[in-house]
């Protein structure tokens, strides 16, 4: 067994190379406590313990998938995630988050893509921004994009957070979603032109784009992320 979610996977990876982290969780149970890195500090907003397992179906390129009388052969490896996770849908924020951020060097934001109520989403974002006032002035704020159930919610999150983040990170599926077409990821000129369009839509200091071929940083002083990108690729491939 293992734990999922962007922040938890990051904490597990960081622990393997000797870096500590602190997590804001929305679900807690015996398995979460058992599988978290022992040195990882955490808070949890859940009023009671629950278990919401996510079913993840991974498939390889050209794998034959039979769905009733149809056969599907995907052009690239990918995955499908099925879940019914009420804690993620509600995304309660623990008021102790403000205190947790006092000494943060890097703050990763992710997880709003599962929310389904606009008023709740706006409330959570307002509370998040209040907590972020406690961040040190030199803290790096990193936003990891995701596939939103409601595309309008993606825009709401961006509009609220764009002025507060230094790095906006996304994968190729999300990248193509913003550009509105398929992109040849092996054509450097097409990728660059598409990144220029994306940067106009999402004017942040740096964009990190990670694909199944490569990862890159685009924007102000992008070279400063070269070692981090290489480390992420090595970690993801081992």
Locate predicted features:
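Ribokinase/PfkB-type carbohydrate-kinase core domain
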Residues: 1-238
């Amino acid at each position: 067994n293992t734990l999922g979610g962007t922040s938890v996977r990051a904490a597990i990876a960081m622990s393997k190379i000797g870096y500590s982290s602190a997590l804001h969780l929305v679900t807690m149970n015996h398995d979460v406590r058992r599988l978290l890195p022992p040195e990882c500090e955490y808070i949890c907003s859940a009023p009671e313990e629950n278990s919401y397992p996510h079913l993840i179906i991974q498939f390889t390129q050209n794998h034959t998938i039979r769905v009733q009388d149809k056969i599907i052969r995907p052009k690239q490896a990918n995955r499908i995630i099925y879940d019914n996770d009420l804690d993620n849908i509600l995304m309660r924020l623990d008021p102790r988050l403000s205190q947790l951020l006092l000494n943060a060097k890097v703050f990763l934001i992710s997880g709003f893509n599962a929310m389904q109520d606009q008023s709740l989403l706006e409330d959570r974002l307002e509370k998040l921004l209040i907590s972020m006032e406690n961040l040190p002035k030199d803290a790096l704020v990193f936003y990891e994009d995701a596939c939103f159930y409601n595309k309008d919610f993606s825009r709401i999150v961006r509009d609220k957070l764009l002025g507060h983040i230094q790095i906006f990170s996304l994968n190729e599926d999300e990248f193509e979603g913003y550009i509105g077409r398929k992109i040849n990821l092996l054509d450097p000129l097409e990728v660059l032109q598409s990144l220029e369009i994306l940067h106009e839509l999402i004017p942040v200091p740096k964009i990190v784009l990670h694909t199944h071929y490569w990862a890159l940083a685009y924007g102000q002083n992008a070279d400063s992320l070269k070692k981090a990108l290489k480390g992420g690729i090595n970690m993801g491939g081992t």
